[in-house]
């Protein structure tokens, strides 16, 4: 039983390599500094997007820094699938509140937000914990914000570790406005709705100067790229960052008219970040 006066563990936000689902893997020491690897190797309690991916990353970590315990002895808990498919923020999670398992006498959680406090019991018992998504920094364009929010509510220290974040790498290399930008997630898959959304984002970028960043499932990248070229104005600046941190990484940022004229070739089967700006 944990005590209100017992030292609490910390929640470490552990970045994962960006090569999830790719044919070739980057050496983990190329993308994660030793300090991050050392912390990851010390942890035995995890909350994650995908347990299989987390175990695979831990195996790679263990090849560099010995793990504190065999992977089979680690406690690895996945976030509910609804959280990673719909997000764990206000609005996206209407209805998920009913799945919360803590009693109403605990600190309140606003309606419509997934209650992740039960996942942090190990930290309340004094154990350090890790949060990991399938690729990149958890809770940024990935699941995990509900866990971080719960940690703050419970008085658990949150420690972000250094590692890759695809959105920031893409933005930095794009030439788009890095002082005012938004990540808008996935665009609609329906062709008509997708084109409408693309034009809305373009209008917002033109009106405010705010860069608009978004992603897509790799097998839909080619369709999205075609829709962007067909829907955007010729003068709009369009960026695609493909396979970031991989040997085949490319970041190309041009006006739409120039993309059309040069027939930009990209590794669109790799994870991509797309950007629209002025």
Feature locations, PLM:
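A contiguous loop/helix-start segment that scaffolds small-molecule binding in enzyme catalytic cores
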Residues: 2, 8-12, 75, 124-128, ...
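Glycine-rich, flexible N-terminal cofactor/catalytic loop recognition
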Residues: 2-86, 97
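Short glycine-rich anion-binding loops that position phosphate/pyrophosphate groups of nucleotides
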Residues: 18-20, 52, 134-138, 218-220, ...
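Short, solvent-exposed amphipathic alpha-helical segments in soluble enzyme
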Residues: 35-37, 62-64, 146-148, 227-233, ...
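Short active-site oxyanion
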Residues: 40-46, 156-159, 211-212
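Acidic beta-strand-to-loop metal/phosphate-binding motif
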Residues: 47-49, 130-135, 211-216
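Glycine/small-residue-rich loop that forms an oxyanion/phosphate-binding "nest" at active or ligand-binding sites
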Residues: 78-141, 145, 150-153
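Class I SAM-dependent methyltransferase SAM-binding "motif I" and its flanking Rossmann-like core
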Residues: 141-204
């Amino acid at each position: 039983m944990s005590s209100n006066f017992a030292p609490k563990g910390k929640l470490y936000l552990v970045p994962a390599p960006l090569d999830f689902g790719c044919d070739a893997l980057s050496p983990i020491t190329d993308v994660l500094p030793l300090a991050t690897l050392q912390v990851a190797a010390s942890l035995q309690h995890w909350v994650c997007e995908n347990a299989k991916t987390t175990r695979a990353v831990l195996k790679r970590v263990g090849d560099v820094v010995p793990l504190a315990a065999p992977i089979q002895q680690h406690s690895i808990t996945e976030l509910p699938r609804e959280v990673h498919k719909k997000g764990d923020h206000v609005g996206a999670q209407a209805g998920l509140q009913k799945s919360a398992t803590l009693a109403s006498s605990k600190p309140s959680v606003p309606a419509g937000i997934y209650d992740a406090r039960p996942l942090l019991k190990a930290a309340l018992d004094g154990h350090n914990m890790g949060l990991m998504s399938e690729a990149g920094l958890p809770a940024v364009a990935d699941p995990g914000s509900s866990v971080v929010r719960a940690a703050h509510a419970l008085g658990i220290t949150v420690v972000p570790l250094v590692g890759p974040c695809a959105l920031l790498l893409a933005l930095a290399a794009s030439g788009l406005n890095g002082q005012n930008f938004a990540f808008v997630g996935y665009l609609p898959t329906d062709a008509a709705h997708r084109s409408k959304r693309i034009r809305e984002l373009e209008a917002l970028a033109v009106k405010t100067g705010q860069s608009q960043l978004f992603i897509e499932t790799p097998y839909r990248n080619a369709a999205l790229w075609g829709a962007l070229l067909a829907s955007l104005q010729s003068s709009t600046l369009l960026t695609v960052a493909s396979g970031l941190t991989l040997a085949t990484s490319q970041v190309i940022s041009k006006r739409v008219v120039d993309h059309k004229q040069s027939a930009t070739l990209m590794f669109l089967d790799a994870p991509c970040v797309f950007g629209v700006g002025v």
